[in-house]
Amino acid sequence: MPEELKVPRLVTVAEKRAMEEDFHMSSARDTGQLLRTLAASKPGGRLLEIGTGVGVGAGWLLDGMDPAARLITLEVHPEAAQISKEMLASDSRVEVVQANAVDWLRAYDGPLFDLIFVDASVPKYEERALTLSRIAPGGLFVCDDVIWSAAWDPQVRPSKDRVDKFRAEIHGEPDFHVSLLDWGPGICVATRITADAGH
């Protein structure tokens, strides 16, 4: 079976639930495949997802993770968090936390993360420094929606100014090697290259 057709069952179920809930912010399948690949590069890793939605992105991450890896996924909206807890309850490697991501990141004092996937605006834009400070040396910062589209709903998607500012600034992060992938919704992948993670 071609790799592009290997969609995890959990992702299929979560995508169906997203349609039922009229939720249109889930990770696209090409983004999901990249998440799975990157998760597989972190055996025994500590992963963080910011913006669970109803569990589509988490499903892809879990499919790439080995048995020793662990995922914390944060969702600010109580209803979506509850759906995700139900969707992901069968996998002991994941913990769904209903919380404001910025507040959670500020309070977090545990080990640094080997991969952080950000699918929420404030931790990606205004509070990016806080998010990056929680990444271990060699760890990955991944986010999507870095190519602005006029088709985006301004009520739920970032403005063109925010996206353009992100693209202009991200290559200036001194402790990271950065790649912007201009396919799908636009993907940023950055790797921490220094041992000083500010933690």
List PLM regions with ranges.
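A short alpha-helical cap/connector motif
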Residues: 1-115, 122-142, 146-199
